[in-house]
Amino acid sequence: MQLGVRLRFQKFEYPEANPEALPEGIDPEEYIIGTYYMSFPKGMNPFEITQVLALEQSTGTWLPVPGETPEVRRKHVAKVVGVYEIPDYEIMVPQEVDWRNFIVQIAFPWRNIGSKLSMLFSTVVGNISMAPKLKLLDLRFPKEFVKGFKGPKFGIEGVRDVLGVKDRPLLNNMIKPDVYSPPDLGAKLAYEVARGGVDIIKDDELLANPEFNRIEERVPKFMEAIDRADEEKGEKTLYAVNVTADLPEVLENAERAIELGANCLLVNYLATGFPVLRALAEDESIKVPIMAHMDVAGAYYVSPISGVRSTLILGKLPRLAGADIVVYPAPYGKAPMMEEKYIEVAKQHRYPFYHIKPCFPMPSGGIAPIMVPKLVNTLGKDFVVAAGGGIHAHPDGPAAGARAFRQAIDAAMQGYTDLRKYAEENNLQELLKALQL
């Protein structure tokens, strides 16, 4: 949306038919409240342009039209309920200021949308995402809207019940190399990391169902290898099979993987779209946990002045759609994310949210054993450690790499921050060698 275009809209004498209101003048249970960062050139009236944006995302267009009557407006118009300038100039805008920055709140009638994630995105992001400086920061959902969603089928407690692990973070391994053939190579690595002590093995997000590594071949080989490892170690391991594909293949992949024995699914939820994640999570025939991978997320959240905030795109929304585990960036490895944002995303996964179960945060991206105490210090025990190369690159092999991470988790849960000291005191050679990588 070009802010320089002349936009006109009709104002009615009835306040309830206009695209603005006091926060106290609306029923919060009838509206989804979107909070935005917006910036406008100095000469523009922020109160008028924000109302134009509200109309653009509800009843209006760039000119008044006959059908947009007061009655239509009363039922369906979005309303600006807050425009707050930062800093809050009261006397005058300084001459040197060219762009003025605002926090804006717009209330959208949720019945315009229904409990549909595709229409939610079309409404709260939609056309206005083309404004040069506009970023969606948060969405406040009314309880009645959220009643239409089931959320995670397992959640934190359910995944822990499946694995029988209650008192520590879980350990996940991504098979490396990311893309490989034949499937036997991955199955061999899966056996090694499973017997070394990982709780979850996931396909890389880049490997789903290519001709050279079909789900029909891969899943039986992986599950046989994992079953052997579980028998040896006396613990259970989940295998998250990547079912990502276009519709309807993604749903067919999920059905096929489960028929072949898969006990967990992985989907690249932003590549497929939130409705696909939701369809998998709410399918009664799918009785396994679902892991949601973050790829494509950077296109939404990385810009400080446009897009969608990380706490929404990585936090609240995948949880609402039904993810049991959400993969997202950790600030301690190769992924760029501020530590406070990474913590805030985890809060969106775990804090109370009506009837929606908490889900596991899974910080990822270049994680090494030395980072585990930081992860535990910032997130506690209810998260999943995501380790890929940090396990497979261990000089004594993947099983030793997995043991090194388990040792690091044990140390962190005992309050150790100096892993070398802990490893030396307990003669843990796997951890000592991992700390040298």
UniProtKB/Swiss-Prot annotation:
InterPro entries in UniProt: RuBisCO, RuBisCO_lsu_C, RuBisCO_lsu_C_sf, RuBisCO_lsu_fd_N, RuBisCO_lsu_N_sf
Cofactor comment text: Binds 1 Mg(2+) ion per subunit.
Keywords: Magnesium, Metal-binding
Chain sites annotated for binding Mg(2+): 202, 204-205
Cofactor requirements of the protein: Mg(2+)
CDD domains: RuBisCO_IV_RLP (cd08205)
UniProt-listed Gene3D superfamilies: Ribulose bisphosphate carboxylase, large subunit, C-terminal domain (3.20.20.110), RuBisCO large subunit, N-terminal domain (3.30.70.150)
Modified residues (N6-carboxylysine): 202
Transmembrane segments: none
An example Gene Ontology biological process: carbon fixation
Pfam families cross-referenced by the UniProt entry: RuBisCO_large (PF00016), RuBisCO_large_N (PF02788)
Catalytic-site annotation from UniProt: 176 (proton acceptor), 293 (proton acceptor)
One term of GO molecular function: ribulose-bisphosphate carboxylase activity
Functional description taken from the UniProt entry: May be involved in sulfur metabolism and oxidative stress response. Does not show RuBisCO activity.
Subunit record text: Homodimer.
Protein family according to the UniProt entry: Belongs to the RuBisCO large chain family. Type IV subfamily.
Name used for this protein in its record: Ribulose bisphosphate carboxylase-like protein
Species annotation: Archaeoglobus fulgidus (strain ATCC 49558 / DSM 4304 / JCM 9628 / NBRC 100126 / VC-16)
